[in-house]
Structures are given as structure tokens and as C-alpha cells.
Amino acid sequence: MSFKDKDERISCLEAYVTLTSKSSRFTDETEILKMSQRHSGQAGTEAGNGADSPPIVNSKYSTFRDFCSTSSFQDSGYNELKSCSFDNIDKEYLGKKEKGPTLLYEHPETSGLGLTHPLESPTQKKKCILPRKEKDKTPELCETPKISGKKCLPRRRLNVSFALLKGDFESQNSSLESSISQVINLEKNIPSSASGFSRANNFSPLVTSTLKTEEVTSCSQKLRLNFSQQKTSTIDDSKDDCSLFEVECISPIQGNNFKDSITHDFSDSSLCINDENACPELLGSSVSGTTCGTDEDIFVTPISNLVANIRFNASQILSPSPEVRGSISTPEDSGFNSLSLEKSEDSLSDQEGSFQELLQKHKGTPKVGDTIRKTRHLGRSRRLSTLREQSSQSETEEEKQIVHPDSEKRAAAASAISEGQLSSDESGDLTFSLKNLSKTPALQLVHELFMKSKRKRLQENSGHEFLEQGDGEKIAVLQCILAGLIGKKMGIEKLDILTELKYRNLKHILAMVLESLTAESLCSVWKVSRNWREIVVQDKNANRRRKFYITQLKTDSEGAVLNVEDAATRLQLLNRSALRSVQAQARIPGSQREQGSTLSPWGEVLTPLASSSVTHLSSKQEEYVKVAKTLFTDEALKPCPRCQSPAKYQPYKKRGLCSRTACGFDFCVLCLCAYHGSEECSRGAAKPRNRKDALPGSAQSKRNLKRL
């Protein structure tokens, strides 16, 4: 009889192990319920036979007790079993317990301590009835047949898509909850006298533990935690965060149903119990395991969090909302849900940074992982905002012509600054203003331009024109400041220096530049651009020189209109050396210059063009007359070879001196070079004198005159 009961109990235990390994598939739950109903009918027929029938085995609770024994490892789990004692004590059955046989069971997959499962009396069988059949007196067995075939590892089943389970989720969820409630009610109704001996005669381990139940559980679970981290976790050891080992690490949604889960007690169970009042004695600690205090007791294993993953995927597909996203604490290490999180992160708006900052303010001290993730989000949002602001950059180019080629870099920096300012205005953590850019007017201008473009886009929805006027005034002031900025044109290949000097109102520098130019260069400057033309007009001296040069060009092009016979000869004074003393004494009457029509010295009427040249000639003649009054008897006048002004020279010494104080050129009359004294001329005389030529007033000249 004992061997038969042992075989049946082992078959029940193996059936439950199969149920636990296949619990992630909802299709198996329907078969489990059908088989349990079938065995309940058989158990009802056997209940009428008496005490010879096999006792009811609560497979789930036995597995839980096996878990308690195996999870404690070397520390004895006897006290833990004692804490999970049964409440309903049958006093009549205690007297008969000593004679009843006891059976020793071990978990087929573990090598820990064995647990005793005694025979149960018929009176106890009547108490182990499911809630829906409490009125009936037929017990029910939770047994499933062995399933043959290739077993699938639990870790491989994590890759099962939720789309395959979506159709059967609603229909099979109710059956799953009903089966869970059946198992829980079985646990509640199991009597505390489950062992075949009295408490005094129970088998006790050789070494008993002095730790409390919570300490034993936490110690054993810490050992399992180390194993799970070595096998399945990618968590960095340097990061200390108590929230790493929550179910949030795989399912980051905290709902009310999460508080009802007993994942921290049933770490190998993938079932989530929603009944808060179900079997509170079997729970090692409070059910609210979401706080930081119980985070150390929660295991990060894929099997224990399978249902959490399924619920997270269900809530994400069926009812996605951005508000749930705001209330989560995103995990630092989650190799199972990183792909789904990154897909949702790509759809964030540009204000992700400010949203995360607000979340950090409410949560308190920021975490290291959250900081890294926030920088990642900010980098992604910055890249998105840079792509979106390319259109706004074209608008700002229409509003303000930026000549600097490096302004694109400053524009990118200013866009980042403006984004930082917008996000800081929302979060209130940072304060940024133009005071930080007080010494960089160029950056101020670029910043104002980008802020204006952003406000312009905001004003499309709500029309406020007064803000636009304020922006225009700020930009005008900054442009005035930027006009005097030194070094803002650095790096440009071509630069209009004269225009820049004009904008800075540096007229004295422009006057020096124009004075160094010739009249011909001034005419060329006039033809360059409108700005350069205005520069020449503003300088009166340069403009006068330009006009005079133009008149000379016209005179040279049209030629002289003078028809006087000796007009050409009189201009060449070097060829008229014999009559030079006579020409110095000639005068032009002043009455002729006052007449309406200009007359030549010989009484001929001249055209206006010819009169201008004669006027110039008359001024030269007046200079010669003025200098001739100061001549000595042995001196004569000769034009200076450099400035053509009257110069005094001595024929015997062959030396001349310019009368103009500005020139004062001392030259040799023969070679027209600088006076060199008694030395021979470096080059031949300007005009070698003929031997027949005689000095005026000499005997040879008198003879020549007589001969004529």
C-alpha cells in the first residue's frame, strides 16, 4: 500500500513539475483544468471506499516546500517549514499519526533536504475540496499526465512573440485565474497536521538554524541572486542601485496588480496571483514588494518575470499611452526589453530633455544610469532638432545677411543654446540669459536671430505682433554694436577695406589713402563701385584733383586750338636762348584779361578751350616776370628740368638754381643733372653748342649781325 501511494505521489509531483515548466503557455492550462476535473471525478469514487484510498496531494504546496528546502542550501530549512505550518489541526488525527507511515520525497531536480508528506485521513480529504465544490464531498486531484516530446528550455521561450498569444489572451486568462484560485484554496484548507508523526516526533535536522524566516529567505535568495547575475544579468558591478532587482527591470510598468504578485516568494513560479487575501500565511513578507526595502529579495530571472513581460507587452500593444511612460523608472540593465524600449524612445519629442529633468526633480537624487540615458536622449533629440532647424536657418538668412563663413558653427552653437534655454525654462534648473554673452556681440546677434525664428514659429498659432517689434529693436541695437566689432571679418578671402573704413566713419584714414593716390588712380577708384564713389566725393581735395585730370585729358585729346604762328615756338624756351632776356621783359596788359572775350597777347580771339590753356600760360609768364625783376646782369632765366618753374642760371659757371622754394633744384645747365662742379658731365650736354654760335653782345655776334 505504501509503495502504491508513493508511486502516485511521485506521479503527482512530476505532473506538477511539468505544469511549472509549461506554465508560460496558456494552451496547457486548459488541458490541466480538464485533467483535474477528470481526476476529481475519480477521486470522488475512491472517497467512498474509506481510508484505503490514496490521499490528496497539494502539488503546488509541496513544490513550494521543496523550494523552501532547496533555496536555503546548507542553512537548514526546517525552521522555514515550521513557519509555514498548517493552521487547521485535527486533534482526533494526532493520536493516530504515530502509527501512520511516512513518506520521504525529494525534488527531482534538486539535491536538497527531503520533506515528509504523510497520509491523510478521510476527514482531511473532505476539507481539501475546491471552493466551487465545497458542498460536494468529493475531493479533487490536481494531476496531469506526463507529456512526452522534446522539452523547450524556459529561456528560449522568452523569444515567443506576444502576437501569437494575443488572440487567446482574454479567453485563457480567465481559466488561468480560476486554476490559480483552486490551488490557493487547496493551500488554505490543508491541515497543519500534514506529517505522519506528532510535532515532538518529527524528524529534525542535525543542525538547526537560529535565523528568522525572513532572514533565511533573504539569505537563500541572495545566493540565487548571485547565480542569476552570473548567468543572465548584464548589470555592471560598479552600479549600486536597489531598484535593479525589481520586476521593473524586465517590465517597467508599475500597476496595482504588481503589488498583488508574490514573485519574491515564488521565484520559480511564472503565475501571478491577483487575490490579495489568498493564503497570507504562505507569504514570507508583505505583498507590497515594490519598495526599495524588499528589492534585495527579488530575483532577476527570465522565468519569474515571464508574466510581467507578457503583461507589459499587452499593455504596450492594447493600451499605449504617454502618461504611463512618464511614471516609470527606466532600467539601467535590461537585456530582455532593451529593443522595445529603444523603439519607443525614437518616437519621443524634442522636449525629452526637459521632461526627464522634471521627472528627476520629482524623484529626487538622479541615478547614474538615468544620467547616461538622459545624455543619450538629449543627443538623439539634438540630432532631430538640428534636422528640423534647417528650414529655420533659411528663414534667418533672409532676415539678416551673415557674411562670416564660420557663422554656421556659431549658428549651430546658438541653436543648442536656445534649446538649452527652452528646456531650462520648463524645468527651472538652469538659468541662461544674454548676460553670459555680454562680451560677445556677434554671438548675441546670432542668438537673437534664432530666438526670433523660434518665436515666429510659436506666433503662427497665437498672433502677438508686439513681440516681433521688440525683437526688431534688439536686433537693431546688436547690429550697431556688431558694426564696431574688431575681428568679425577674419577668415574672409576678399574684404572691402575702404567700405569698412567708411562704415566706421574713419574719414582721416580715408583722406590719407586718397592723398597717396595719383589723379589717374582716383579716376579708377571712381569707377569701382557706388561706395567708393561716395568716398571720393566726401574728400574735396581728391575730388578736385580728379576733375582737373579729366579736363587735362579732354584738352590733350582735342589738341590746341591756338592758331598763332609762334605759339608752339614760344613754349619751347630752350630753343630761344638768344631772345630770353627780351621775353623776360614782356608783359601782358591786364585789360585784356578783363574783357568778355578772351584775347591772345597778339589780339586774336580765342575759344574757351584755348583760353584755358592761355590762362595757364599767362600764370607761368607772370611767374617768369616776377623772377626776372630780381635778376643780376650776369644771370638769366631757364626752366627747371624737374618742375618747369623759372630758374636762375649763370652762363659762365654753367650752373642753375630753381626759384621755387619747394623744389630748389641745383643743376648743371649742360647736362641738366645735379650740379657736379668742375667735373665733366656724366653724359653729353643736352644740346652741344655750335662753334658758329656766339654769345650775344660779343664781337662775333656783332660781326654776324653786320653780315646779315
Swiss-Prot record:
UniProt GO MF annotations: zinc ion binding
Residue stretches of biased makeup (Basic residues): 374-385
Modified residues (Phosphothreonine): T234
SUPFAM superfamilies referenced in this protein's UniProt entry, alphabetically: RING/U-box (SSF57850)
GO biological process per UniProt: meiotic cell cycle; negative regulation of cell cycle process; negative regulation of meiotic nuclear division; protein ubiquitination; regulation of mitotic nuclear division
Binding site for Zn(2+) 1: C640, C643, C658, C663
Sites of Phosphoserine modification: S76, S334
Sequence positions that bind Zn(2+) 2: C668, C671, H676, C681
Zinc finger (ZBR-type) boundaries: 636-684
This protein's GO CC annotations: nucleus
Tissues in which the protein is found: Expressed in the testis.
Keywords for this protein: Disease variant, Meiosis, Metal-binding, Phosphoprotein, Ubl conjugation, Ubl conjugation pathway, Zinc, Zinc-finger
Effect noted on mutating G149A: In SPGF64; uncertain significance
Gene3D superfamilies, per the entry: 1.20.1280.50, 2.20.25.20
Biased composition (Basic and acidic residues): 399-411
F-box domain boundaries: 490-547
Superkingdom of source: Eukaryota
InterPro entries listed in its UniProt record: F-box_dom, FBX5_43, IBR_dom, ZF_ZBR
Record region (Disordered): 35-55, 320-426, 682-708
Entry-linked CDD domains: BRcat_RBR_FBXO43, F-box_FBXO43
Composition bias, Polar residues: 327-337
Pathway entry: Protein modification; protein ubiquitination
Known disease link: Oocyte/zygote/embryo maturation arrest 12: An autosomal recessive disorder characterized by infertility due to early embryonic arrest.
Assembly: Part of a SCF (SKP1-cullin-F-box) protein ligase complex. According to PubMed:34595750 interaction with SKP1 does not occur. Interacts with ANAPC2; the interaction is direct, ANAPC4, CDC16, CDC23; the interaction is direct, ANAPC10; the interaction is direct and CDC26, during spermatogenesis. May interact with CDC20.
Protein name (record): F-box only protein 43
Organism: Homo sapiens (Human)
Name of the gene: FBXO43
